């Protein structure tokens, strides 16, 4: 399966809608998108993972890398996810303590840092 990405601006946040599989083959596409956004001055990102069907360790690494990039600019990276199979990966790896995870884009956009 492939990876789909789209971006939109909501207030001062950039929302990245992700769909499909984030794995060793598709993660570089997500990494490029996050790097490009940060390089263009978007330091407050919301990654909407509601359309993600699969996530592996490569995908987790890309998200952690994105978080480091935005934090270097006093920014934030928030996730939106309600899917138990994806949330389980974040719990098992302890990344629920690293990433703020929200139930909706609206909630993530409204959250303050």
From Swiss-Prot:
Domain STAS residue range list: 3-112
Tree of life domain: Bacteria
Keywords: Phosphoprotein
Record PROSITE patterns: STAS
Free-text description of this protein's post-translational modifications in UniProt: Phosphorylated by RsbW on a serine residue.
InterPro entries reported in the protein's UniProt record: Anti-sigma_ant, STAS_dom, STAS_dom_sf
Recorded GO MF terms: anti-sigma factor antagonist activity; identical protein binding
Family membership noted in the UniProt record: Belongs to the anti-sigma-factor antagonist family.
Name recorded for this polypeptide: Anti-sigma-B factor antagonist
Annotated organism of origin: Streptomyces coelicolor (strain ATCC BAA-471 / A3(2) / M145)
Gene: rsbV
